[in-house]
């Protein structure tokens, strides 16, 4: 009955949207007997199923809630009890209102709720975004660490520092050795550092170091976007970012200015893999250059 109610509710919501989501299919990938990864349009969804109720991680866009719900029902007909947001962005939280309508409890970092309650500015486009509807706000929030014990699984929620945004979290399924890391790791694009929502490139590097210290070689890693990954994939991504950071730092030390950096084509060998996504190589390397300049200023200030 709960899923039937959701389908009715979502049908009303979807009617007000563009039909661009009509062709999207939600595909469920089984990781363990109780954990699935769902792919569609937007951020990857994680799902823990079992008799205690379902725990869902991220919910993509509002017009997809009906399709997501059908996919979940095909895995486990039980109710979704908890919905965890990995961060604030709408391609991960767009369905919050729809699922909350059914009494699903929303969980996120403190900063996610704080930012949803306020007007924000997209620094890439200078567009002003109004506060999210109250129905989208998380009801349970935390600062650094939170634990769930559900369906004979121990689930850890970790917040390390600002990275992609200031509210990014990593979800660890301890017994299953499965991790959902949100957009701290994106297999389809160079990183988007959302400074308007507290993002920080240097902090992203710290986050990746922390993630790699947490996981082992047998772990299954759900990225924010793209296919299921391993520790080796995360390590390669982290190494790429450090390499680009160091190459930018060398160029600027030799006299190059921030605006000179994109013309150096420092991302060229990675563009085929990461340069076709949301953030292009020349846009990303400019973010890195700004971060390097900020690090240099900070060092001078501390002297």
What residues fall within each predicted segment?
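Divalent metal-coordination and catalytic microenvironments
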Residues: 34, 48, 58, 72, ...
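Conserved beta-strand hairpin/beta-sheet module of binuclear metal-dependent hydrolase folds
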Residues: 27-72, 171-172, 177-181
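Accessory terminal helices/loops
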Residues: 14-19, 213-215, 228-303
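Active-site metal-binding motif and surrounding structural segment of the metallo-beta-lactamase
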Residues: 51-52, 63-107
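Solvent-exposed loop/turn segments at secondary-structure junctions
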Residues: 42-45, 54-56, 61-64, 88-93, ...
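Metallo-beta-lactamase
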Residues: 30-31, 53-54, 61-63, 113-160, 165-166, 174-175, ...
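Bacterial Sec-dependent N-terminal signal peptides
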Residues: 1-19
